[in-house]
Amino acid sequence: NESTMEANMDAAFNYLKNIDSESEEMPAVAQSKGTSLYCLENTMEAKAQQLGFTTKVVVKAKYTPYGLNENSSYFSWKGNYYTLDQLKTEYLKHSDGSGLKVDLPIFLKKAGIMTQEQFDGDQDTKNSVVASLSEGATATQLNAKTGIIGRFCAVRYYHESVCYYDVLIRHDQNVTEKMALGRYGVVRNNWYHLELQSVSGPGTPWIPDPSDPDNP
């Protein structure tokens, strides 16, 4: 049975998945310090060394851009970062049918905060939803699930500065050429040690899982 085989392979590889609704539980990203994990061997052709095929580690961390309060929630849009109040102010600067007046409603609808009826309504309806945005635990408020459910949009929401980074596992450190055979992968009877020394910017507010529509 092909579907059973696929389910067994998914379980064996144990990859993290995003959620699509408020009713789903947040995926646990946790590992005790100093412990190790076993994973299946995973090698591929050079041209196949991409996010959807390469074994990696997902790092959950908090990154707050300069100028914002540490561990606070914020939005990103076109390379800029905003608190909720700043985003509302920026939103009002844009003409109807352009900029944030387009991108923010798209994000809010994807995240489940704006209903389809509100999204299809007039500009005043959308403006009202934006004006009433707040943080909280309900489905229509900004919370820990919002950024994950509303993934792949121009507007991103980082709840309490939480973000995710994916770190591809390098098999051969001596292979310096990008996409060269053996650069990435997991080979049996090998021990891999990953050390994260620094980050230069926020990751994604969603878990970078194999369904991401991006190459490395």
Language-model regions, residue ranges each:
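C-terminal functional modules
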Residues: 183, 188, 210-216
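Tryptophan-paired
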Residues: 1-198
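Substrate-binding/catalytic groove segments of enzymes
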Residues: 200-207
